[in-house]
Amino acid sequence: ISNSIQRAQKKVEENNFGIRKRLLEYDDVMNKQRNVIYGKRQHALFGDRLALDIDNAFYVVAEGLISGFREQEDYEGFKMACIVNFGLDTAIDEERFKKGDINTVVEQLYTEASESYARRKDDLKKNAIPVFKNIRQTQGSHIENVVVPFSDGRKGLNVVTPLDKTLQTEGEELANSLEKTITLTVIDEAWKEHLRAMDDLKQ
């Protein structure tokens, strides 16, 4: 009987050790992920490398769309995904999508997305400057920050931008504030979703 008890106790201790080891590994992975996320948030908050992060995101999304929809042989789905993800009707035709060199096609979509984004940024700046000048003239110098609402048709957010700096930079500061706010929102929402999924996994 005492041998049976010892064997059972040893088995329980081995199981507990395995559980503790897995929890430590889980915590280690979570810490590494947390460091990456906080690094991305720092880039967004302080502007460090934010442009590079956005540029990299364009490339990663372009690569994912091409490889994913090409594998499914779904050109129409690809065209729709370009509209949803990049807000553009791609010039990549069905023949090129299906048979072109994948790296060249990815590069083309990335270039289209980057150029479209740059044009929209320029339009935003051009359209915003008269409004900001009007605010300065009609409201006087006591206005420091302006809240600008933005929406993609599904979600809306308010972007706070400094009035003087936006005027001094010909709207560049507004574009930067928008990029920061969107990037932080996307990172935070994805991180919360990831934490919920990891908690479910931990259970």
Regions found by a protein language model. Give the residues of each.
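Extended, charged helical/alpha-beta scaffold domains that provide interaction surfaces
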Residues: 1-203
